[in-house]
Regions:
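Helical mechanochemical/support elements of P-loop NTPase systems and associated helical scaffolds
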Residues: 208, 212, 312, 316, ...
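Dynamic helix-loop-helix/coil hinge segments at AAA+ ATPase domain boundaries and subdomain interfaces
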Residues: 199-233, 559-567
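Conserved ASCE/P-loop NTPase catalytic core
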Residues: 223-355, 359-363, 377, 495-512
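Conserved P-loop NTPase/AAA+ ATPase motor core
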Residues: 508-587
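Phosphate-sensing "switch" segment of ASCE/P-loop ATPases
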Residues: 335-342, 347-456
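C-terminal helical "lid" subdomain and adjoining coupling/linker elements of P-loop NTPases
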Residues: 393-395, 421-497, 502, 506-520, ...
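Conserved, well-folded catalytic cores of nucleic-acid-processing
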Residues: 219-223, 309, 323-327, 348, ...
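Extended, charged/polar low-complexity intrinsically disordered regions
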Residues: 2-219
């Protein structure tokens, strides 16, 4: 780590640049932690309020702002179990202010907009045209708002409705059965109602790569000064599904490393599905209601605790494989397309060394997924969660970062752009990468370019750093496929070629022990390398490992796939060894 004085200077420089370029869109993250512990509200709502009331360096103003935010949340935030109590207060007082998630829909038949309140449980509340026209996110999934409500049973309350001439409709012009006594007097979004992506591009130019990386990590709540460079890159990789369409990511690792934090707390555009049973109707398409499932409603669908994933439908995994490969799926007579990314996170209960020797790094997946090479081949990126430290209090930042809603929205805007071809100017991918490998690497490169260089300005060296990381993330998937599927996935020696020097450079994965086919030095006991022809006739290098474990003398094979001849050969060798064991010297 750098000396404290140098760190402080760097932090101050970053804070000053943030104030100059993103004033009103940054917040001190320790304030979020202070209030979040006692308030069950999304982080992005909390930080928007803090950004409004605590945008100062004066501790007195900040403290007053924190108290204001606490009062607003205590008095106005709607808890679902208190919805009827709040409606009763509204009826009694005639008006009340609430904080809730508001979604607006256009009723074509009645030619007017109606609002729905998520926690309050209200539906079909008329709303003036000016609000959805001014805040278009109300129509695109909804946003959190502070809403002043009125309760009026009689009179000429126009409920926000206007006729075709723009004049307020009178009560006599409306059917009483279609009306609710509740109306919206004023609505104020407490999320970013819209985003100016050019502001982000212009502001990015003021920062170096390392400074911008620190800003992005602090915006997610991490303290970059407690992380080494590789850990920073790995944590940024968690954001790739939010910035890339149809990106399939897997992260397996120890507990308490924050694997699901980003998908649950940081982005309002992603949903975390806890491990358990799910259905094709819920995830993809409900044929009865003719409605698209989660993949059509969210930018990212993350599955927590992958070991518990189970589809009630027999064709669930097949449909998921189709979607992960093409971004579309067929249900009934229709084919539907969606852009949601898929994320699989879970815990590894053994050390990585043990998993590599006895099974594969996909072992925590349920058997129908973890041994299906066609499913696993569709994963673009495998984050080595065991390299990320277990989070302690010092890993969470107290410094300035973007309001999470601002971060989430400009990341969402960047999903519309493509930078996967950025590497073609300087590099060419090696021959061992097939089409799926190439797509995966390009998606990872494109995602990192969007996160680190949203202004599109980067050097060859910076792009090479991203490319090496992308090749490693995809090769980790391919190495495990080779263990599960045998020589069908022999082409794992990923490389790239520099178009200036035509030098080919190979990229390995750290846990495999280097990039050579046969490592230098003596092999571990029970491990040998041999050269032979595979089933296709191609000559290849094979590594054989044997282990003796406590048990009943049963012989088990792993890593051979479904090749019957290969399994029979190992049985023959084992039986020969048993029959001639007394002739083998133990010394």
């Amino acid at each position: 780590m750098e000396p404290n004085a140098e760190n402080n200077c760097r932090r101050d420089a970053i804070k000053e640049k943030l104030r100059q370029n993103f004033d009103g869109k940054i917040v001190r993250k320790d304030l979020t932690k202070k209030i979040k512990e006692g308030a069950n509200v999304p982080v992005y709502v909390l930080e928007f309020l803090l950004g409004q009331y605590c945008s100062s360096d004066d501790e007195a103003i900040i403290e007053k702002g924190v108290q204001n935010v606490k009062h607003i949340l205590a008095d106005n935030f709607v808890r679902p179990d208190e919805a009827q109590k709040i409606l009763s207060q509204l009826r009694k007082k005639g008006s009340h202010t609430v904080i809730d998630m508001i979604t607006v829909n256009l009723d074509i038949k009645k030619n007017c907009f109606f609002a729905s309140f998520s926690n309050l449980g209200l539906d079909k509340v008329p709303i003036a045209d000016e609000y959805p026209e001014k805040y278009d996110r109300l129509l695109c999934g909804g946003i959190w708002c502070i809403v002043q409500l009125d309760y009026e049973v009689e009179g000429d309350n126009n409920f926000g409705l206007v006729d075709l001439g723009g004049e307020p409709l009178q009560s006599s012009q409306k059917k009483q059965k279609d009306l609710t006594p509740i109306s919206i007097r004023k609505l104020t979004p407490i999320q970013m109602p819209h985003i100016d992506i050019e502001e982000v591009r212009t502001g990015r130019k003021a920062f170096t790569q390392d400074e911008w990386m620190d800003v992005m990590l602090r915006s997610c709540g991490y303290e970059p000064e407690q992380l080494n460079q590789r850990e920073k890159w790995l944590l940024l990789a968690r954001m790739l599904p939010l910035v890339e369409n149809n990106f399939n990511l897997c992260e397996l690792g120890p507990r308490s490393t924050g694997k699901s934090h980003i998908y649950k707390e940081i982005s309002p555009n992603s949903i975390l599905v806890s491990g358990g049973q799910t259905t094709v109707a819920n995830l993809f398409y409900n044929m009865g209601r003719k409605t698209v499932g989660l993949v059509g409603l969210w930018d990212c669908v993350a599955f927590d605790e992958v070991a518990g994933i189970k589809f009630k439908d027999k064709d669930g995994i097949q449909i998921m494989k189709d979607y992960m490969a093409s971004g579309s799926f067929a249900r009934g007579k229709e084919e539907k397309a969606a852009s949601a990314s898929m994320v699989f996170v879970g815990n590894i209960n053994q050390s990585v060394d043990v998993l590599l020797k006895t099974s594969s790094l996909f072992d925590p997946f349920p058997p129908e997924m973890g041994t299906d090479t066609a499913f696993l081949d569709r994963l673009h990126c495998y984050i080595p969660g065991w390299e990320i430290p277990k989070f302690r209090p010092e890993h969470f930042t107290n410094d300035y970062g973007f309001i999470t809603d601002y971060l989430a929205e400009f990341i969402r805007e960047l999903r519309k752009e493509q930078y996967g071809d950025a590497l073609d100017k300087y590099f060419r991918l090696g021959k061992n990468l097939n089409q799926r490998d190439t797509i995966a690497v390009r998606k990872i490169v494109g995602g990192y370019v969007k996160l680190l260089y949203p202004d599109g300005e980067f050097t060859k060296e910076q792009l090479e750093e991203i490319l090496i990381f992308a090749l490693e993330m995809r090769r980790r998937v391919k190495e495990q496929l080779k263990k599960l599927g045998g020589m069908e996935f022999y082409d794992v020696n990923f490389s790239y070629i520099d178009l200036d020097t035509f030098e080919e450079k190979f990229v390995s994965v750290p846990e495999q022990g280097g990039g050579k086919l046969i490592p230098d030095g003596m092999c571990n006991p029970g491990q040998i390398y041999t050269v032979s022809r595979g089933k296709s006739g191609m000559i290849g290098v094979f590594r054989l490992e044997s282990q003796m474990l406590p048990g009943g003398g049963k012989f088990e094979r792993t890593g051979l796939g479904s090749d019957r001849d290969c399994r029979e050969s190992t049985n023959t060798a084992f039986n020969f060894l048993k029959a001639n064991g007394n002739r083998i010297s133990g010394g």
